[in-house]
């Protein structure tokens, strides 16, 4: 009896370590399985997140890249959609003849040439909305059917905020002068009109484009001076000069200057007021209201030039506007090494300070906005 008990106890002692080892192995397997499962789930979520990000934020940019060969494939499968004005008038459409040959047609000819752009060069709206114009709403079955039958799908139409009557008025007002006119809706930032001259007839692009490319930059018809031309901002820049002064001097209401019709600073330049106007005693508000060059050509000497520069860069001077269409970078050059004359000239928006008409208007829109706005979305 005692021997049986001992034998039974011995068996229990002998089997227990094996059970423990098996359980440890099983636990280790479960842990490895969980780790592998976690890795696969994490990878799947990362891929899914990237696909969502790509389709929502990057698809248009990638597809519109001129090096993306997919564009060529889309143009072979999709008839480019129309570009419409705010009232529905057609600004660009695709004409198809009996033989199936496609021609991009611009009904308003020169009037909208720069803002609508060229489909062949991917400029203006033609470039910004290239992805949408070549995208279709058809389902996969319809697309496969079109591919098999050799028929093309039709791309989306793109509706702009452009107003033909305003565009034509701006075009007529600019006449034969070189320059640009831009009009925007303050509450939304929508572009209502954009004219640049010299201009061109986009319907002649197939035959004339190579010749246009050869024009001197000063006479270039392809240059959109509304976004790519750089000009002195003039008195419109005094807003930024005044703003920086107010930021640096809480007692700005005590500012005082006696205008004699011009201002001179030792080592600098004599800066006259417009038409030699003598404004007399000026505080900051009066100086701003009178656009007194005497006030603003001297006020820069009281400013911290690094802070002045930072303010201007906050308004996208020395930065890309990132507005979709082709644009030049506006310049503000003052720094600690700037000379007296340059500081004088910059204070009144002259000298080396340069801005595009579009950029200047976007800044002006911020003054009229009742709430803060990202200038890139003005």
What are these regions (language model features)?
Residues 49, 237, 358, 375-376:
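Residue-level micro-sites within transmembrane alpha helices that shape
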Residues 175, 246, 373-374:
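Solvent-exposed alpha-helix faces
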Residues 1-210, 221, 230, 255, ...:
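Periplasmic/cell-envelope proteins involved in peptidoglycan metabolism and beta-lactam response
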Residues 2-9, 20, 87, 187-235, ...:
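Beta-lactam-recognizing serine transpeptidase/beta-lactamase-like catalytic domain environment
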Residues 367-378:
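Single conserved hydrophobic/aromatic residue that forms the stacking wall/gate
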């Amino acid at each position: 009896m005692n021997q049986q008990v001992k034998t039974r106890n011995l068996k229990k002692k002998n089997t227990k370590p094996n059970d423990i080892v098996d359980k440890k192995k099983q636990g280790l397997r479960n842990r490895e399985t969980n780790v592998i499962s976690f890795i696969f789930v994490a990878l799947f979520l990362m891929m899914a997140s990237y696909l969502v990000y790509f389709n929502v934020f990057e698809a248009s940019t990638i597809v519109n890249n001129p090096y993306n060969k997919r564009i060529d494939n889309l143009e072979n499968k999709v008839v480019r959609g129309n570009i419409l004005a705010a009232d529905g008038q057609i600004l660009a459409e695709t004409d198809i003849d009996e033989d199936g040959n496609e021609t991009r047609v611009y009904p308003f000819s020169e009037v909208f040439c720069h803002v609508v752009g060229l489909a062949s060069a991917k400029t203006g709206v033609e470039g910004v909305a290239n992805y949408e114009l070549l995208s279709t709403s058809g389902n996969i079955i319809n697309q496969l059917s079109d591919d098999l039958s050799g028929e093309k799908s039709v791309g989306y139409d793109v509706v702009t905020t452009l107003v033909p009557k305003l565009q034509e008025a701006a075009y007529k007002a600019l006449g034969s002068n070189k320059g640009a006119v831009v009009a925007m809706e303050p509450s939304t930032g929508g572009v209502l009109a954009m004219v640049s001259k010299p201009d061109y007839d986009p319907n002649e692009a197939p035959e004339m484009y190579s010749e246009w490319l050869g024009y001197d930059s000063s006479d270039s018809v392809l240059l959109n001076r509304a976004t790519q031309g750089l000009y002195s901002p003039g008195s419109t820049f005094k807003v930024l000069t005044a703003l920086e002064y107010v930021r640096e001097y809480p007692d700005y209401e005590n500012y005082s200057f006696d205008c004699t019709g011009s201002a001179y600073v030792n080592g600098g330049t004599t800066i006259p007021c417009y038409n030699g106007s003598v404004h007399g005693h000026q505080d900051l508000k009066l100086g701003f209201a009178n656009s007194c060059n005497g006030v603003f050509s001297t006020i820069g000497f009281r400013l911290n030039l690094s802070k002045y520069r930072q303010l201007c860069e906050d308004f996208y001077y020395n930065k890309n506007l990132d507005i979709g269409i082709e644009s030049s970078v506006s310049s503000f050059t003052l720094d600690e090494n700037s000379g007296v004359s340059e500081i004088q000239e910059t204070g009144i928006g002259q000298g080396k300070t340069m801005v595009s008409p579009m950029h200047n208007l976007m800044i002006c829109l911020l003054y009229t906005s009742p709430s803060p706005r990202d200038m890139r979305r003005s």
